[in-house]
């Protein structure tokens, strides 16, 4: 039976996994870094191939965010090796990050990545883990629909903004329809705090205040470039 999905805010479970880069102990292998774990249904499949190419082409963008990547499927290590060799030979793209081999589905089951109706295919999932090994985000995608890698980049950046500045990011940040690239101030816990925030920040009301200029402009523009790239690719 598939395992229970770990919850956001919980510690990523300790495990030793096999990859084409050798054995890796998680989460210690990425200690001090953010990392994105993404599972895919199977090697040598069209949608998964497009995703791996997209992740590889954006790998340097992730590294700029102090973020590493690691894939996972219930394929064997040999299958992973042959698949990434095929991608390099046929598509001219080298896959620089490790891919977990989980042919028995042990890891996938532990992380809740096996569909209830199938024990032979991992679902298309994304886990974002912070430098302390805490799961910060979990996203699932349909079998037939590939992930938007630039949106995953944006999500990682948004999580880092929360960690660094103690602020929340609005919908479509940094291009929010109401407050642009500003960030949201956490709601006040007392009447006094609410009154003070109305004086200190721009507010629509006491419970909805925001702060301008928190994130450096160059960082904002970098995120906008990712989103513009994604929009151009969709045309």
From Swiss-Prot:
GO terms for biological process: cell redox homeostasis; cellular response to stress; hydrogen peroxide catabolic process; response to oxidative stress. Its EC number is 1.11.1.24. Keywords: Antioxidant, Cytoplasm, Disulfide bond, Oxidoreductase, Peroxidase, Redox-active center. It is found in: Cytoplasm. It comes from Staphylothermus marinus (strain ATCC 43588 / DSM 3639 / JCM 9404 / F1). Its main location: cytoplasm. The active site is at residue 48. This is Peroxiredoxin. The keyword Cytoplasm applies. Disulfide bonds join 203-209.
